[in-house]
């Protein structure tokens, strides 16, 4: 997917377990973070990894930035005041996590 879409930025979950914020340590979130970071580096920029992708026209690609959500040491904060209602509307669609 990275070689096909060639993103400049990828946003993912942290692969690190957080004991102070247990929701951030859900096994699925940790697995997604690890899989994403492994896909970004070194695989997406290594032309020798998955050589069949070269045959399909998907050249190696270096992602310029990776933002990691729920990390222990956040360094970027986004003001969502203007989209707060949309944020909660989207969150409530995640019915496996929020049932009421």
Where are these regions (language model features)?
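Metal-dependent de-N-acetylase/amidase catalytic core
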Residues: 1-100
């Amino acid at each position: 997917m990275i070689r096909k879409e060639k993103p400049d930025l990828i946003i993912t979950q942290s692969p690190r377990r957080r004991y102070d914020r247990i929701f951030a340590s859900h096994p699925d979130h940790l697995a997604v973070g690890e899989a994403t970071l492994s896909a970004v580096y070194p695989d997406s920029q290594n032309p020798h990894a998955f050589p069949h992708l070269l045959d399909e026209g998907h050249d190696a690609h270096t992602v310029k930035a990776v933002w990691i959500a729920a990390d222990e040491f956040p360094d970027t904060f986004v003001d969502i005041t203007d989209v707060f209602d949309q944020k909660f509307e989207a969150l409530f669609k995640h019915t496996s996590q929020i049932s009421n």
